[in-house]
Amino acid sequence: MAKAILKFIRVSPIKARLIAREVQGMNAEYAIASLQFTPNKAAGIISKVIASAVANAGLDPVDAVITSARVDKGPVLKRFTPRARGSASPKHKPTAHIMIEVAAATKGDK
């Protein structure tokens, strides 16, 4: 089993979790192919993390299965937008930590 972790990535953890839940338990090659056609910022990022985890394991993407896909909350970047009469409104820019674990596929997983 091998894993890849990407921290402090500028994507909403709530939106990234939706994508991570979809790929958990999938074959790595099939997951990367399906994420390629998903119109979401998090999909491209998670696809690269899956490829990194497969490379860390030293496996072929066909022989790898995603055992765990986790997205945790990172720190929130706080910025301000100028408003009328000298006031300001806060903007919250969330970050996420993405962790993908892969393992070699058994005959039942394919």
UniProtKB/Swiss-Prot annotation:
GO function term, MF aspect, one: structural constituent of ribosome
One GO-annotated biological process of the protein: translation
The organism's place on the tree of life at top rank: Bacteria
Claim: rRNA-binding is one of the keywords in the record: yes
Keywords: Ribonucleoprotein, Ribosomal protein, RNA-binding, rRNA-binding
GO CC term, one of those recorded: cytosolic large ribosomal subunit
Function in brief: This protein binds specifically to 23S rRNA; its binding is stimulated by other ribosomal proteins, e.g. L4, L17, and L20. It is important during the early stages of 50S assembly. It makes multiple contacts with different domains of the 23S rRNA in the assembled 50S subunit and ribosome. The globular domain of the protein is located near the polypeptide exit tunnel on the outside of the subunit, while an extended beta-hairpin is found that lines the wall of the exit tunnel in the center of the 70S ribosome.
Assembly mode: Part of the 50S ribosomal subunit.
HAMAP family from the UniProt entry: Ribosomal_uL22_B
Family according to the record: Belongs to the universal ribosomal protein uL22 family.
Protein name: Large ribosomal subunit protein uL22
Taxonomic path: Bacteria, Pseudomonadati, Campylobacterota, Epsilonproteobacteria, Campylobacterales
